[in-house]
């Protein structure tokens, strides 16, 4: 007979909370930095795009003449607000001495919001990029002439804003991946 005589085998002692929280704290730090990048880049997207204006003789090109550019600015403003709020909350949790992993409900809310905003920003950036392509190359089917040779400053600023918006998409997508990790790494018993 064994030393336990049919009794349940002893369970391994749980690892220390400090060791368990180290990867989560490291991910929280990465999330904090990614959200800061999203905040800064969203500010730049908005600032550069709203200054995308140019007048040549009697003609003018302005960012708010296009619904795609207006949508990009609006989505960037929403992402800016959300990312700033998440940055503040992440910084608070990181600096807190009694730091705990977020609840499953909170993890779901973060995951869903991160997914929605990442895809919204991707869609707005893609629509703006398509408009910029047409502005640069024209469209023979629609008989639209390219305008970037005339409105070079406008096109350069709009293009810079679009490139920045794709950088924001990358930061948001990585934040979303971290949110997914926080949500789906949990055992099914923790609620």
From Swiss-Prot:
Localization, UniProt: Cell membrane
Annotated glycan sites: 137
Chief location: membrane
Claim: Transmembrane helix is one of the keywords in the record: yes
Residue spans, topological domain Cytoplasmic: 1-25, 90-114, 179-191
Topology with respect to the bilayer: Multi-pass membrane protein
UniProt keyword Transmembrane present: yes
One Pfam family in the UniProt entry: CASP_dom
One GO cellular component term noted in the UniProt record for this chain: plasma membrane
Extracellular side: 47-68, 136-157
Protein name in the entry: CASP-like protein 2U3
Membrane-spanning residues: 26-46, 69-89, 115-135, 158-178
Superkingdom of the organism of origin: Eukaryota
The entry's keywords: Cell membrane, Glycoprotein, Membrane, Transmembrane, Transmembrane helix
Subunit structure: Homodimer and heterodimers.
Record-linked InterPro entries: CASP/CASPL, CASP_dom
Membership in a protein family: Belongs to the Casparian strip membrane proteins (CASP) family.
